Amino acid sequence: MGLNLDDKKAVVAEVSAQVANAQTIAVAEYRGIAVGDLTGLRAKARESGVYLRVLKNTLVRRAIAETPFAGLSDQLVGPLIYGISEDPVAAAKVLNDFAKGNDKLVLKAGSYAGNTLDKAGVQALASIPSREELLARLLGVMQAPVTGFACTLAALAKKREEEVAA
């Protein structure tokens, strides 16, 4: 049974709210995927903070009209699942990682920072480390000289203690 007009308006409003806060939209064709696999994908998306949903393409076109994602409208053909996220790489990463293990999920397109991405662009976006990973790397780089300096001071103090004891 199809959606009535009120249901369609509610879906467009819900997707519009997600898109308003989003930095990235990733789109994939899901034809032939088992329900259990799709449920697993949804669970991974929830863990990553990605809004993942199968939607009617016409409703998505209405929701993304007059947004930075409007260029994606031409790519919305066929049975698609949409990943929408505030994190710049999360949606692309969730769909790309799942597509690596399941050949029935085919990445189609995406949009980031007002640019429409093809399949290769979505895969490239997915390969970028997340913000948390980048911050952890930066912290490690900043912490390394301090740690080295502390080890040097400790070794120097130990050497002086040995000289005094001798």
UniProtKB/Swiss-Prot annotation:
One Gene Ontology biological process: translation
CDD domains, A to Z: Ribosomal_L10
Domain of life of the organism encoding this protein: Bacteria
InterPro entries: Ribosomal_uL10 (IPR001790), Ribosomal_uL10-like_sf (IPR043141), Ribosomal_uL10_bac (IPR022973), Ribosomal_uL10_bac_type (IPR047865)
Assigned keywords, A-Z: Ribonucleoprotein, Ribosomal protein, RNA-binding, rRNA-binding
One term under GO cellular component: ribosome
Pfam family name, one: Ribosomal_L10
Function: Forms part of the ribosomal stalk, playing a central role in the interaction of the ribosome with GTP-bound translation factors.
NCBIfam families registered for this protein in UniProt: PRK00099.1-1
Oligomeric and partner information: Part of the ribosomal stalk of the 50S ribosomal subunit. The N-terminus interacts with L11 and the large rRNA to form the base of the stalk. The C-terminus forms an elongated spine to which L12 dimers bind in a sequential fashion forming a multimeric L10(L12)X complex.
Family: Belongs to the universal ribosomal protein uL10 family.
Protein name: Large ribosomal subunit protein uL10
Lineage, broadest ranks: Bacteria, Pseudomonadati, Pseudomonadota, Betaproteobacteria, Rhodocyclales
Gene field: rplJ
